[in-house]
């Protein structure tokens, strides 16, 4: 995969430039554009993934299915599709927006900061997973209700962005729609 960049943003969310992804994530990470996605299978189960230990931020942490950064000129939806193929080896249904104005800042235990305008999407797949070990060290298909109970009881066991997304009332309602079989 070619070198990825992040799209830097000003406080109003207007693009101001780009920076190489690895170099962008530091103790002083500038605001940038990202996305987060929640992937459901044909049984209505959610895919939760454990980030590879080689990840710069939050290595080894359980999180939602796929996260990433759209590239210059790429839509968020196309970025979700690209990263699902790269990280999970799957084709997905067109991503649906479930929390379009999500924005957060969080610092991991090693001092690396995430500072993102991060629209949240959900999609479905019927493909068998082909996990990229450079991105994902473990995964589990789970009932959404069980995951939400786990987040409510032990938020420290999950990525902060997953917790913030899952505790948003409207996002929970929209995620629940993906548990219905189609």
Swiss-Prot record:
Residues binding Mn(2+): 25, 32, 69, 114, 116
GO cellular component, one term: cytoplasm
Subunit annotation: Homodimer.
Organism classification: Bacteria, Pseudomonadati, Pseudomonadota, Gammaproteobacteria, Enterobacterales
Enzyme nomenclature, EC number: 5.3.3.2
Primary role: Catalyzes the 1,3-allylic rearrangement of the homoallylic substrate isopentenyl (IPP) to its highly electrophilic allylic isomer, dimethylallyl diphosphate (DMAPP).
Residue ranges annotated for the Nudix hydrolase domain, each copy included: 30-164
Active site, renumbered: 67, 116
Name listed for the protein in its UniProt record: Isopentenyl-diphosphate Delta-isomerase
NCBIfam families: IPP_isom_1, PRK03759.1
Cofactor(s) of this protein: Mg(2+); Mn(2+)
UniProt keyword annotations, A-Z: Cytoplasm, Isomerase, Isoprene biosynthesis, Magnesium, Manganese, Metal-binding
Subcellular location: Cytoplasm
Pathway: Isoprenoid biosynthesis; dimethylallyl diphosphate biosynthesis; dimethylallyl diphosphate from isopentenyl diphosphate: step 1/1
Annotated cofactor note: Binds 1 Mg(2+) ion per subunit. The magnesium ion binds only when substrate is bound. Binds 1 Mn(2+) ion per subunit.
Organism: Shigella dysenteriae serotype 1 (strain Sd197)
Catalytic activity: isopentenyl diphosphate = dimethylallyl diphosphate
Any one GO molecular function term: isopentenyl-diphosphate delta-isomerase activity
GO BP of this protein: dimethylallyl diphosphate biosynthetic process; isoprenoid biosynthetic process
Family annotation (PROSITE patterns): NUDIX
UniProt binding sites for Mg(2+): 67, 87
Disulfide bonds: none
Annotated family: Belongs to the IPP isomerase type 1 family.
